[in-house]
Amino acid sequence: MCGIVGAIAQRDVAEILLEGLRRLEYRGYDSAGLAVVDAEGHMTRLRRLGKVQMLAQAAEEHPLHGGTGIAHTRWATHGEPSEANAHPHVSEHIVVVHNGIIENHEPLREALKARGYTFVSETDTEVIAHLVNWELKQGGTLREAVLRAIPQLRGAYGTVIMDSRHPDTLLAARSGSPLVIGLGMGENFIASDQLALLPVTRRFIFLEEGDIAEITRRSVNIFDKTGAEVKRQDIESNLQYDAGDKGIYRHYMQKEIYEQPNAIKNTLTGRISHGQVDLSELGPNADELLSKVEHIQILACGTSYNSGMVSRYWFESLAGIPCDVEIASEFRYRKSAVRRNSLMITLSQSGETADTLAGLRLSKELGYLGSLAICNVPGSSLVRESDLALMTNAGTEIGVASTKAFTTQLTVLLMLVAKLSRLKGLDASIEHDIVHGLQALPSRIEQMLSQDKRIEALAEDFSDKHHALFLGRGDQYPIALEGALKLKEISYIHAEAYAAGELKHGPLALIDADMPVIVVAPNNELLEKLKSNIEEVRARGGQLYVFADQDAGFVGSDNMHIIEMPHVEEVIAPIFYTVPLQLLAYHVALIKGTDVDQPRNLAKSVTVE
């Protein structure tokens, strides 16, 4: 959600900025822009509505020269998508890019208008530009002006500021929205995501909450909000950006669906030893903390919330630990009672999800036993701020609709369940069954992917549909939720998911020949109950699409399509049955002609409320 790239060097930086923006496209955006300043203080700004490629074409037509620059991809919050609202925003010689939301932008706007400033956009960002300009007019350096301006802003933001009169310096401020400095040789960089800077550096400083950074070609100085200098450690990143080529695939999402067997293998690598789960990466004190856990509270948003919902069944049935799962944006704004010895687990692909981070920070005040992050991005805010962390190791996920990040989150959660069951002294067969299932999972998914053509053919039935209903029971109910989310995200078909036992409590009224009903049906103890629910739909003329275990005993008919799945171990069934629902959503979206990798109005990483 929005992207920032900045650079200060002796060479022209426009192409560095553009490449950084290309690497941030996956986050979602509606417009893009950049501004560069040369050594004489001449500033050139380009902005375009639409894709980064349109901005790059404009830069070819109007070459940009200058060693200092900032660039941005915008996801509209205040003001419609337009070139006028695209960043960077300018106030005379002050140039600003900004991620986040300035909550008090309206009173600041009125105060600045009263001082004679004219606004040319609808954005909250332009307020920052004029405010810094005003403070600079009161005297002092750009850093001093920024230090006076920042306390006047309320909200979550990350901003980078440039003064065309002094092109030897960039100023940056972080409050709730991530910023990372990239360290070079005689040149330095800044971005909202380290992925943007991997072509130019592997050394990074992650700014912490409240940090204000002054960046020149040869130095980086960091201050707190009072102006006192603080030290931040620089780290060497081994993060790989492996998504530049879609290869044989049409979309990143398709590629990432097919990468799941290898992604899960990577998640398991080094974590299973002698038939047991080995999470020694958590550190020497982790076992002591985990052995005290009497309750688990999970916070997440979107797809990560659905993975938390699945794991609740596992934690309670396999490890005997009560577990609650809550949407992070709800948790942070209500008064909650903390259970004794409760472990806070946060789930996020990016590690920068604003509501999840806020929930984690709140949990530190509420007296939780400890915190554990499950994340795909090493060095992210969620990882740095948690007591313990487990990486999913899924590799870079570019498609906005999450696929391999979801299945690898579930893989890590299931390993954690095995670890806790052992620490609780439960029957060793629990861990044995989990390990056996996880080791078999990659090959099981490869088997399932061979059914792609069958699912593609079924997708034709959805081309004229406007609604769909997903059903599941037990730990397959959250998989139904995830299937509905995928379909609505990328095909724009309204989809809902219900626990199948809830059919008679409302959803049955929706059933007719135009309502496709998608069911996940592994061969487990709830199968007979699920078959009764399926018959309720069938009797009312509903069109059924049942993803069923090959041994489940279903017989197809005109209004019931059976997609047979290979039998899988019960413990891994939720992960396995996710994949055909991903493929269904993908093929329906293809038929409908939507933007699969960057669906409308959505962003990969939601870094604002």
Curated annotation (Swiss-Prot):
The active site is at 2 (nucleophile), 604 (for fru-6p isomerization activity). InterPro entries: GATase_2_dom, GFAT, GFAT_N, GlmS/AgaS_SIS, GlmS/FrlB_SIS, Ntn_hydrolases_N, SIS_dom, SIS_dom_sf. Pfam families: GATase_6, SIS. The gene is glmS. GO terms for cellular component: cytosol. Residues 2-218 form the Glutamine amidotransferase type-2 domain. One of its GO terms (biological process) is carbohydrate metabolic process. SUPFAM superfamilies: N-terminal nucleophile aminohydrolases (Ntn hydrolases), SIS domain. It catalyses: D-fructose 6-phosphate + L-glutamine = D-glucosamine 6-phosphate + L-glutamate. This is Glutamine--fructose-6-phosphate aminotransferase [isomerizing]. Residues 286-426, 458-599 form the SIS domain. GO terms for molecular function: carbohydrate derivative binding; glutamine-fructose-6-phosphate transaminase (isomerizing) activity. It is found in: Cytoplasm. Its EC number is 2.6.1.16. The keyword Cytoplasm applies. Homodimer. Catalyzes the first step in hexosamine metabolism, converting fructose-6P into glucosamine-6P using glutamine as a nitrogen source. The keyword Repeat applies. Its main location: cytoplasm. Keywords: Aminotransferase, Cytoplasm, Glutamine amidotransferase, Repeat, Transferase. It comes from Escherichia coli O6:H1 (strain CFT073 / ATCC 700928 / UPEC).
